[in-house]
Amino acid sequence: LTIIITILQPMLWLVMYSSVAGSTMQNTGIKNYTAFILPGLIVLVSFGVCSSGGIMNYLMKNDGSFYRILIAPIHRSSIVLGQLLEAVLCSFFEVTIMVIVSLFFSVRIPLNISIILYIIILIFLMSFFMAGICYAISLILPNEVMYETVMNAIVLPIFFLSTALFPANNIHGALAIAIHINPFTHVINILRSFILYERLDIGQMIFVMILFMI
């Protein structure tokens, strides 16, 4: 159920929004708009999965299982790591579904194994980073209502203040600065460069990886 809920919105963006906006965006030089927005939707899917991991903490607290886990003879860091890795694995599962569906909309994923390995590492670090943030926020806030409000206040600006839906070439001023300092803009650009041009910006890749590992 969680997988269906978290992937539903990005899937609607992929299927419906790309079809409607694709013809308009062709005037900007974007030939395959579905391929263009796929990287941003991959980030959105990861955010959704990691956010749902925080919701699970509240559900576990309500039924008492959260506190039973705390008194179990297991190191607490192992418990946290297990929950974070669960979110990462779910992210990979949903990203895989998104990529498979995108193939039916004329998206062609380059079969460059070496670059794909780098992309897998990037998605892993990004998902692990987001899962850690969501987990920490869920431990701080008292209930799921506040948690969902805060997560929406974080996710939506990050998504829209990026290059997820449009190129940032002709954007200037404060909006351009906000887009360029958004770390997920760089993740999206790396994924897009691979999907559209089968290229990998090693410098940008290293920068983002270091940022997520801090």
Where are these regions (language model features)?
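Hydrophobic alpha-helical transmembrane segments of integral membrane proteins
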Residues: 6-7, 35-36, 153-154, 159-163, ...
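Hydrophobic alpha-helical transmembrane segments of multi-pass membrane transport proteins
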Residues: 12-16, 33-104, 134, 153, ...
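Short helix-capping/hinge motifs at transmembrane helix termini and TM-loop junctions
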Residues: 17-26, 48, 102-110, 114, ...
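Membrane-interfacial helix-loop-helix junctions in multi-pass membrane proteins
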Residues: 24-27, 159-213
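Short amphipathic alpha-helical coupling elements at transmembrane boundaries
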Residues: 64-71, 142, 152, 176-180, ...
